């Protein structure tokens, strides 16, 4: 999982969804499981 300051480019990728867990914002992708990132 990468830690990025901006998730805007990652949420454009097909199959990705933005999830908020414990006050942090994550991008997860079921189609491409390598595409994971946390904002911070």
From Swiss-Prot:
The UniProt entry, under NCBIfam families, shows: PRK00831.1
Family annotation (InterPro entries) = Ribosomal_bL36, Ribosomal_bL36_sp, Ribosomal_L36_bact
Q: What is this protein called?
A: Large ribosomal subunit protein bL36B
Stored PANTHER family? 50S RIBOSOMAL PROTEIN L36 2, LARGE RIBOSOMAL SUBUNIT PROTEIN BL36B
- Name the HAMAP family on file: Ribosomal_bL36 (MF_00251)
Q: What is the lineage of its organism?
A: Bacteria, Bacillati, Actinomycetota, Actinomycetes, Micrococcales
Q: Which GO terms describe its cellular component?
A: ribonucleoprotein complex; ribosome
GN (gene name): rpmJ2
Question: What Pfam family is a match for this entry?
Answer: Ribosomal_L36
GO MF annotation: an example: structural constituent of ribosome
GO BP terms, alphabetized: translation
What family is this? Belongs to the bacterial ribosomal protein bL36 family.
Transmembrane regions listed in the UniProt entry: none
Specify the domain of life of the species encoding this protein.
Bacteria
Keywords on record: Ribonucleoprotein, Ribosomal protein
């Amino acid at each position: 999982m990468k830690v990025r300051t901006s998730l805007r480019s990652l949420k454009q990728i097909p199959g990705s969804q933005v999830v908020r867990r414990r006050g942090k914002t994550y991008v997860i992708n079921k189609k491409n499981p390598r595409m994971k990132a946390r904002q911070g």
